[in-house]
Amino acid sequence: MFKGSYVALITPFKNGAVDEAAFVKLVEWQIEQGTHGLVPCGTTGESPTLSHDEHKRVVELCVKTAKGRVPVIAGAGSNNTVEAIELTRFAKKVGADAVLSVTGYYNKPSQEGIFAHFKAVNDAVDIPIILYNIPGRTIVDITLETMTRLFELKNVVGVKDATANLARVSLQRQEMGAEFCQLSGEDATALGFNAHGGVGCISVTANVAPALCSAFQEATLDGDYRKALEIQDRLMPLHNALFVDPNPAPVKYAANLLGLCANELRLPLVPASAAAEQKVLGAMRSAGLLN
């Protein structure tokens, strides 16, 4: 089972192109700092503005750099089922351990359409699938009934849940059991998520605080919620600051402060505002990540 702190990796850019050297450096640093797993080419990785070739290259580079030291869950979702299958097939080819597959966005499929989409991916490629339920971005929500049907498919092993509805964790656990891998998609609510039966988080904050995020997850999984709460209190200002402006603008600014990459995004995303920068800077200092 996938569990612990999985980092939703940013994609570094330099002069408009993917900065492969910075990406490799980031992956190596994450592993050194104790991150439990890597998730390239998701929302935080600016996948909507990566070309297909860039997307595939980033996934391949992540797998090659990790060298099996930690699992790689490759972003492979699309609102075009054929495209999702293509990206999933490539992820398997280069050795990813699983894929993160988002619900159809913009075209707003019905529950039957959501099921048919993921079944097509499941049937086409033999690789573990983590469903990505983020209705705030996709407009559609995978209902409990549909989630239960999807878990009956051979390759569907769990969900990245970014609904911020903590009761859903318990409901899904009741329907599908503890073997259904539930990963939080919200840093701020990850404490409660794991208390309800979750086993980890695909984290934005882990880009700049990997050791703390890993220690936090280890504490919750060990049942040491006193220690987890101490870390949560330390990180909470940063969790909030990283979403003052649209993600990943604030976290790229934070990564730049640590010398990890340039503070560069692709349009239509723009760098964090001056006000957001001040909040991020203060939160980084509060967490002990900067002097």
UniProtKB/Swiss-Prot annotation:
CC per GO annotation: cytosol
Substrates-to-products reaction catalysed: L-aspartate 4-semialdehyde + pyruvate = (2S,4S)-4-hydroxy-2,3,4,5-tetrahydrodipicolinate + H2O + H(+)
Primary residence: cytoplasm
Positions annotated to bind pyruvate: T44, I202
Disulfide bonds: none
Record's keyword annotation contains Lyase: yes
EC number of this enzyme: 4.3.3.7
Site positions per UniProt: Part of a proton relay during catalysis: T43, Y106
Active site: Y132, K160
Signal peptide: none
Pathway where this protein functions: Amino-acid biosynthesis; L-lysine biosynthesis via DAP pathway; (S)-tetrahydrodipicolinate from L-aspartate: step 3/4
Gene Ontology terms, MF aspect: 4-hydroxy-tetrahydrodipicolinate synthase activity
Pfam family, one: DHDPS
Swiss-Prot/TrEMBL GO biological process terms: diaminopimelate biosynthetic process; lysine biosynthetic process via diaminopimelate
Cited function: Catalyzes the condensation of (S)-aspartate-beta-semialdehyde [(S)-ASA] and pyruvate to 4-hydroxy-tetrahydrodipicolinate (HTPA).
Family, similarity comment: Belongs to the DapA family.
Subunit structure as annotated in this protein's UniProt entry: Homotetramer; dimer of dimers.
PANTHER family assigned to the protein according to its UniProt record, in alphabetical order: 4-HYDROXY-2-OXOGLUTARATE ALDOLASE, MITOCHONDRIAL, DIHYDRODIPICOLINATE SYNTHASE
Protein name (database record): 4-hydroxy-tetrahydrodipicolinate synthase
Organism (species): Parvibaculum lavamentivorans (strain DS-1 / DSM 13023 / NCIMB 13966)
Lineage: Bacteria, Pseudomonadati, Pseudomonadota, Alphaproteobacteria, Hyphomicrobiales
